[in-house]
Design a protein with these regions (language model features):
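Sequence-specific dsDNA recognition surfaces
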Residues: 42-53, 57-92
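Non-catalytic DNA-recognition/assembly elements of restriction-modification systems
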Residues: 1-54, 68-71, 174-214
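A short beta-sheet element
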Residues: 95-143, 149-152, 158-162
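Short capping/connector residues at structural and topological boundaries
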Residues: 36, 57, 67-68, 73-74, ...
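Structured loop/turn residues at beta-strand edges in well-structured enzyme cores
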Residues: 39, 91, 162
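A structural signal for short secondary-structure junctions
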Residues: 89-90, 114-115, 202
Length: 214
């Protein structure tokens, strides 16, 4: 019964987060439709290339392509690697995108810092005010279609980094960006609360099952 209740509540929280993500996506699409001027993706972000030994990253969070779920569903779990491996050091609010077989649409808006391998592209907004906008831009199916249009290789296609940065994005005015960020911030806060609730339920489930099994 305890396990069923925890699973049921977690399922509700997952659906709530999916609905919140879809709501924000609809807002972004509507705002983008009203904007005529475009610019390159490189105008608001760049690739993170800083590398550290994995042992130097306090969170011990490791991400490879296997940890990122298809269809923009975030991560399934955190992986592990050797302490001496050099990894790309990502931070909270960076966007991680699997660069192997981009048609799987694997991406994650980082909720913590950590390290990722070379098969994962790490995008970082050039200014913090662009973080939520960057997330929404890379969330679009059109972005992944564009990446595939310049991908190299047949069996294991990879996106071309230079090509990706030429992706055309809407030029949000300061007022439009401010409005979007206010909504995005509210959505992100609610999603974070739901994630905390899911984690708490999972912890409670394990504690209760341990007690009952004695």
């Amino acid at each position: 019964i305890i396990k069923f209740i925890c699973i049921h509540n977690c399922s509700i929280s997952f659906r709530l987060n999916d609905n919140l993500a879809e709501y924000l996506n609809c807002i972004f699409i509507e705002l983008a439709k009203s904007i005529q001027e475009t610019t390159s993706l490189s105008a608001i972000c760049g690739y993170v290339t800083d590398k550290l030994a994995f042992s130097d990253i306090e969170t011990a969070v490791y991400i490879s392509t296997e940890n990122i779920l298809p269809d923009k569903q975030g991560v399934s779990s955190f992986g592990s690697t050797s302490a001496s491996e050099r990894v790309v050091h990502f931070r909270e609010e960076d966007v991680l995108v699997s660069n192997i077989r981009p048609y799987f649409k694997k991406m994650w808006f980082a909720t913590t810092e950590g390290g990722c391998n070379a098969d994962v592209l790490c995008f970082r907004a050039s200014d913090k005010k662009y973080s939520y906008l960057l997330k929404s831009i890379l969330f679009q199916d059109g972005f992944f279609d564009y990446v595939m249009s310049g991908a190299k290789g047949t069996k294991m296609p990879r996106g071309d980094k230079n090509h990706i940065m030429q992706y055309q994005i809407p030029c949000f005015s300061d007022q439009q960006l401010q409005k979007f960020n206010a909504l995005a911030s509210s959505v992100e806060q609610n999603q974070a609360l739901n994630r905390q609730e899911m984690a708490s339920l999972e912890t409670a489930k394990h504690m209760l099952l341990t007690i009952l099994s004695r």
